[in-house]
Amino acid sequence: MKPICLVTAPVATRSGYGAHSRDICRALIKLDTYDVRIWPVRWGNTPMNALHIDDPNDKVIIDRLLQDPQLERQPEVHIHIVIPTEFQPVGKYNIGITAGLETTLCKPEWLQGMNKMNLNLVPANFVKNTLANISFDVVDDRTQKNAGILKNEKPLEVLFEGVDTNIYKKTNEFSKSLVAEIDKVDEKFNFLYVGHWLQGNLGSDRKDTGMLVKVFCETFKNMKTKPALIMKTSGAGFSVLDREQILNKIHDIKKGIAGDLPN
């Protein structure tokens, strides 16, 4: 009887965490060491339609999805792929996997979550070093005196995010729809941005996408030969309404910049 490995993750979502979760699940299944069970959770408002039954790479995941998180026994291993505030140590050995952060500080609750796990994995040395060096003073609510230091006390390692070279590779084969869209671009030099445009006013959205548009327009305005900015972005819903909201944001930013602006 194989040991049970329960993976709690947004495995069905069209999100960065979803893609990483699917990579982890496929690797565990291919390893064939554990009885892999998968409990799918949401990731914000991102659609949960990333898995396709007719895709063999997805079917191995779909076949292991749980309808109920209750198992016949405590899992030997629990892998929780979310932000650390949500980490739950429900297994005999618990691994937290998080993308971490893009800055130099996190909430104290992140460290509390990491300390619940036996091992924490992050995708880059920057994230590892940042989380390893963050600490907070703990103040006693009753006496208002220092009661210690809150810091990460559990093993923290880097597990880099790989790439599927069956998809991401040089090729001379392009879909008709892609060719049709690219043919609409007149500029000879183009920048490509891929990422979410999340909530927040200009300069306050998490990925700073709005400021990217602003700086691009201000940098290349009034040039005789301008580059273009191609954006593969969305809010969270991947809908027509989402697209229109993105276009309105771009329009509002460009409206506040004088000059002959790039596309």
Regions found by a protein language model. Give the residues of each.
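Extended catalytic core of nucleotide-activated donor transferases of GT-like folds
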Residues: 6-8, 45-131
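Donor nucleotide-sugar binding/catalytic pocket of nucleotide-sugar-dependent glycosyltransferases
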Residues: 119-177
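Short beta-strand segments
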Residues: 6-9, 37-40, 79-82, 160, ...
